[in-house]
């Protein structure tokens, strides 16, 4: 408990003597309600306005009262102000001491602490502090109300004194009481909040009871499949008497040994053309196209028109329509090298028509010939006042039957399809209830918790990276 004294005029003795009113508090008091606070504030402003009009006769009357043995009210209130300041400091100290932090119990590192017991102790401490605060609140409210009534009655007993000066003093007294009660309300709010429970701490485990992890042998890095890129060239002959089988045999025996490239396949086409599939790099295809041996044997070689290279232009604004895109592509990138008619034969739009309602941007795919490909190989195209990133689209074969690489479904040796989600046979990914498991990574001893043929697959990602590096 904290005791404090407020110096005030005792109305029961005519205001001639000064008494003391003890004030006890266990913790703090709460603030006035909103309506009471507003009322006191309005009263204080009105009294301050009246006090500003204090006149000299009022001061003379106060001096006369003091000479007759009546103490000056303002001086008495000044002492009351000082006492109230002491009371506010004492209340603050009481609030700080009302809920001392609980001493931390000794922690046994071999046994996990009981979190529920610690929480109960903290809750009990907070409840006791709140009850003490509310008990002190009632006592303080009663004391402050009685103090205000006694001061006002003392002022009324002073006859012949101008009330303006007394109103100013009462206003100052009310403001100080209001500040004290607001401060006590803040302290009570802080006391009413329960302390946070202690954080749970894990028990230290000894080496004896620590779980033993199984020893796993290190997995060697798996061998990744070598990337195979397939390009095709078509050979035609002007001699109608020469069959497709004869053309293929002539190329196999008379042309292929002098090409200096690895020929993957030589087969006959229905139109009596011959198709040469080479692989490993674009440079090998260029060697086949530049060979003069074909002309010496009366053969014409050209790249397969069905496999024109493709270029992707990224993040094109959908506000630019397809026709406007192609027109700007020619004017800003190909105008100095080919006419509009030549451009339309060399560059074809593969992406279906888009509009502004399809989103903010769209990736545009173009099918180009070798001449246009050399121009777009710089990596940037200019449309209107924008510059867009572009890159050649590299084709990598992936089998959707066995989910392997380097061959198509028509070339797959496996007869039954596997699920793309778990890599097992007998069902499809749409009806699969098994967890995600990459068949390719599992066979190579790598983490397999991802989809096959996805960006999360390290094997498929390495394949794409190597293919892109060759271009």
Swiss-Prot record:
Disulfide bonds: none annotated. The keyword Zinc-finger applies. InterPro entries: Znf_CCHC, Znf_CCHC_sf. Keywords: Metal-binding, Repeat, Transposable element, Zinc, Zinc-finger. Residues 27-39 have a biased composition (Low complexity). Residues 13-57 are annotated as: Disordered. Residues 40-50 have a biased composition (Basic residues). Residues 438-457 are annotated as: Gag-like cysteine motif. A zinc finger (CCHC-type) spans 397-414, 417-434. One of its GO terms (molecular function) is nucleic acid binding. SMART domains: ZnF_C2HC. To corresponding ORF of B.mori (R1BM). This is Uncharacterized 50 kDa protein in type I retrotransposable element R1DM. It comes from Drosophila melanogaster (Fruit fly). The lineage of its organism: Eukaryota, Metazoa, Ecdysozoa, Arthropoda, Hexapoda. The gene is R1A1-element\ORF1.
